[in-house]
């Protein structure tokens, strides 16, 4: 409770009584006759007065002519506390159980330069269970340039007698001054006789209770308010049925327990504890210290409240509060005390990872955190103590900051038991990031508890969005179950959607506003009864080659993910890419499986006409492919194993349906994984997690036949980063941002890209007639964002090579959470039509060659005159998730690096008259080949498979890797072992079964095969189906090598010996090895 609030409530009550309104009655009256009437009688202030409005605290309220509509508004000035502002009473005007729409217009008084121009709308109510603060709108940004419409909803609920009910407008900036106009509060579909109200709601008692579903994993908890714990309240009934752990939503926060110094009030907190004991539940205590919902007196000098308390006084007050609170529950409840842990400190980290600049930090210093833990441990040594925070599940800068903080606290002996991950996520949150965050934080040796779980719908509560939410909840709880060794509790922040703290419209929990089970409930409680959402993915137009080498064109395709478990929670998953032409649907299934078995395999389900029938029709197909390559024989397939699992390439005939652009094909993918038991232990799917694919196509996902991959070109060159369009940029073709993520018009850009050995350069010329950077959020300012995926892995999460680089029109830089910004440079300039952003993004993770393709996208953010982002437009990705997901990036081809033979600074005595002299000298100068001694190259000496492999690695600038022992004839310690490992992982060499034959002399056809794999990595080369060569000894070439040799000959990389023979089984010499490597450089324009 805020400082002076008790005094305010007394004044408020007296005010109402003076004005003759009857306040004290046992039940709220019904509505007036006009159900759609505005409940605010003077919301437009057109009377020229503020009649009907009262003060929260002691601000100055006055009618003014700075109107939104009409002639008058209300000016709010003279604020000195965050909670101060105008208030309006709704006592006697609102009906229990009814929902209301709330709308008002707000504009800042000019000239304030506030760093926190935010408005919060709150409803204060007092009933038999005490005082409550219900958020209607949380921290809406407003500006002085124009009026901002603030919208929210409110549902009235209370226990016993409603004594006080008023709405007030506040701000986290305690001195912010603002105007208010056009305040409208109207009922939503007013409750009529016969409609559902609390006493008519019946919960579903015949469905599985959640605490039993997860009894082998962790307690399932829920945040509660004591006003909803009466036995007749269906919220209490739902709580008792499904949950076995409670946390107080507000009743145990500092302002609730000690509103004034020394006066502790435990009535509401005790009601929750009593309920927990009566229903055999455990509890989490929340929270002993927070920067919010803590009375101002904590931080004030008792002799002069305008001055801050001293460090010693604030520490004394903190210790008194913590000790008194823990002693109360320990003493009153003894062995029955259900509280097993406390959030000692809550939200001490800012979003940028630094310690929050709270009054605790300002007055005490950073050691206030360890002091709080010290006091709590001293008060109750048996209690588990947690640090709790939000946005630490994204595996970004705040996750790392929490890791560093807890590591430091533990190293100093602070008695910290665990980390509370609030987990306020949304329907686009990334499971891989959550998994990485849990495992990172758990590696500190502490418990992990999910403490405030809900899933924001981002304003979309459509049926489609609810089904999408259900899938993510299932994936989330499968992850929690897989991480059960770390997770000791999962707590939802609210029992049902009607009591969520989030602004409406929203539906973030498992039970809806009528307390009925939603799709999300069934997805985690009994997936067989769920209705899966229909996911969609694009198949890009193209005809990849199916064979020993994975076609390079797959690099351009965004994957879908077969990662939803049907059985088990830890096992094989896969990325699946799709392409199409008029004959085939092509799939590349890359399975991650660390327990290889002959039982492992995939199943592909195809519904060619995508009519989603509940039984198979003649166009529907089911294919099975085992990890050893056996299986369905009526499709083209190729299966190879690798260090991560196995890869399946498929060509599925679709010529019979005459496919055309934008057609849809139904598809599902199922993975079967034997983890060593001799039977299938885990089953994973892309779409249908009810596992009905064998007989039912209605839950297959959709594959949309789409255009070829989006590829732009960056040419080699080095511009000056000065925010100007230098002449060098005129050589570059431009791309245009025309993929709308938010809005359909507004600021756009043309962009050009260049590269050199140190940087990727980007020039964006933005058209924007109204520049604004007033938002406190950089992403809402007029700005350009560049997204880079250096290895173009197109993962659903950010890897270490990925980056998000944001620059606004005033050259203010900001970056995504995991982006390495070291060395980043930018410059901007204003133009008649907008602004220019020029950037230099340092390379960190890849070998730079002509033909390299990286993942790339560019985004323009457009702010309106109020600082609100109204437009987002990209070059490629329409998802809006580029900040956390690289799979939708487009592709950028690096080209144009000049050719030119290096000075021949290295020579050997024995190559003076050799036909390959010039070639050997160039390669030796580049350290790609080496002599047998400093003076002898021995060009006629045969070359081994290991030696040629080492040369190719140097050509590609691939670093050696520690040998993992894949081959029986390669031993740790062999000079070539690490080179073999790196080349094997890169797909340059394959071996034959368990042998690599490293010391065998390499044949000419073997050398050509390896060389062409290297050429594919240097360029965008795609192997043609040529078949026979023109060599006289074509019949002597092995079948597996014939097409490779034919392609190499066509490109001029190899030549025959005299008499036009290739001599495929002939042993290659060191001179011939140098010649073919030189040919690779020459033909790829990398000399």
UniProtKB/Swiss-Prot annotation:
Enzyme class: hydrolase
Residues covered by the CBM-cenC domain: 37-188
Gene3D superfamilies listed in its UniProt record: 2.60.40.1190, Galactose-binding domain-like, Glycosidases
GO BP term, pick one: cellulose catabolic process
GO MF assignments: carbohydrate binding; cellulose 1,4-beta-cellobiosidase activity
Superkingdom assignment: Bacteria
Ranges for domain GH10: 204-527
Cleavable signal peptide: 1-30
Chemical reaction(s) catalysed: Hydrolysis of (1->4)-beta-D-glucosidic linkages in cellulose and cellotetraose, releasing cellobiose from the non-reducing ends of the chains
SUPFAM superfamilies: (Trans)glycosidases, CBD9-like, Galactose-binding domain-like
EC number: 3.2.1.91
Active site: 347, 389, 452
Sequence ranges assigned to domain SLH in this UniProt record: 903-966, 967-1025, 1028-1087
Membrane-spanning residues: none
Keywords tagged on the record: Carbohydrate metabolism, Cellulose degradation, Glycosidase, Hydrolase, Polysaccharide degradation, Repeat, Signal
Protein family according to the UniProt entry: Belongs to the glycosyl hydrolase 10 (cellulase F) family.
Protein name according to UniProt: Exoglucanase XynX
